[in-house]
């Protein structure tokens, strides 16, 4: 009995050892097979003329656009410095908006929304002037499409198309040529083959994106007008990560299309149609829908609202204006009347600004609605995220305008001080204009939900490709 137990123990021990060795051998072989697939895919991509053409075009476009945009940024920065240094004591206050350094990579709305604004107790506009001209931002604020060539444009258009042309036949071409059937005949796991194709293709795409990013950074570093600090570098790193997620969406989309269609030409046609819809047609349709669903008041309606809001104070305003005009003509200074003149004009300016601010908020709601409709478009998500990280989106401008409004109240109080305590008025120094901005970390955290959506799109497409490929009849 003891001998039987010993023999049984030896058999079980031998079985466990053999099983362990087989598992290790399978994992080693599987690991070697996966490495071989990845290596083969990388070499195939690198030898492709499509990759070489796309890479060269990307490097040229990124280098040239970054250099040109730096020149534009340098001019705007010099205009800003000249304007702030030449400020003199005068009626009203001029406020200048500093250009964003990362507008060289992601122009966004930085240039379109103007650079300067002049305020006084008589005037508090809701738009800036400069660059595009006063009120030009109303026409450019929510335009969707290819408005400028920069790093973001190259990623959004050129690199995404390059990814499609590289990956559209990653599975279908092998199916058409019969090489996929031979691979399956050698007991190569389907999931491992698809995963190897995914890793190999993703490596090449990320390498191309990294080269493009390094070219842009190199141009910025070598240019004397650009100073890169740790905050800016962190933002650039965040933009690289978002660009990788964006390109990953089109790569996994190409994989699933390539597994569904056996003919590469059909797959390419489908992918190009999808690209045109999600990158061009759908974003512009979302803007048109938002304009139709959220109607904005016309200029005449705004003027009517202003008159109606100010109607209770119109009589007092007219009487004060008439008395103040007579005082000016008579050259007799009445401090109380002068202060009252400032009060009634500031009151009218503030009430009018309420109407203008409401109109501006409606514009913002329209933009947010268009963006929410367009969230299914990877390009809309990508633009929204990188503009927020670069500080060139509409929210940055809105923060600037909030700072302008706060500064207006300070300037109005200073104007009143002239007629109550002139000595204090002369000694009073207007505080430097400031407005709150988001740090790089705050911007990345704020855009995290949209970044997760891009990641989930890639996961969804890859899982779909895996499911289709596992059930595909290779023949």
Task: Give each language-model segment a name.
Residues 215-240:
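Membrane-interfacial helix-loop-helix connectors in multipass membrane proteins
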Residues 50, 150, 154, 158-159, ...:
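Selective transmembrane-helix segments that form parts of the transport pathway or gating/packing helices
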Residues 36, 46, 165-203, 469, ...:
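Helix-loop-helix units of permease transmembrane domains in multi-pass membrane transporters
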Residues 107-119, 147-173, 177:
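Long, hydrophobic alpha-helical segments
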Residues 237-260, 457, 461-462:
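Hydrophobic alpha-helical transmembrane segments of polytopic membrane proteins
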